[in-house]
Structure formats: C-alpha cells, structure tokens
UniProtKB/Swiss-Prot annotation:
Classification lineage: Archaea, Methanobacteriati, Methanobacteriota, Methanomada group, Methanococci
Chain coiled-coil ranges: none
Listed name of the protein: Small ribosomal subunit protein uS14
Sorted UniProt keywords: Metal-binding, Ribonucleoprotein, Ribosomal protein, RNA-binding, rRNA-binding, Zinc
Role, per record: Binds 16S rRNA, required for the assembly of 30S particles.
Cysteines joined through disulfide linkages: none
InterPro entries: Ribosomal_uS14, Ribosomal_uS14_arc, Ribosomal_uS14_CS, RIbosomal_uS14_euk_arc, Ribosomal_uS14_sf
Amino acid sequence: MTKEPFKTKYGQGSKVCKRCGRKGPGIIRKYGLDLCRQCFRELAPKLGFKKYD
C-alpha cells in the first residue's frame, strides 16, 4: 500500500491559483480572486482593474 501525499491545511502551500494551479506566496486572494500574480496580470483588464501611473 502506498501512502497519500500530505495535504497542507494552512499556510502558503494550501493556497492554489484557480486558473493554473500554482502554489506559493504569489497568490492574490483579495475579493475572492484566488489567482497567482501572473494570471492576475493577464486577467486584470478584463476584470475591470486599471493600472495608474
């Protein structure tokens, strides 16, 4: 019998991007987005976020 991998219940390893599945410290969870920063940069204009100088 093989053991199942340990699932993290809390911390950075438990947060995953809804779009690509990345884990780690670059997850944006504000407003329930749950996107990594790379996916957020691609989707931000479609979501209505504007970039100000």
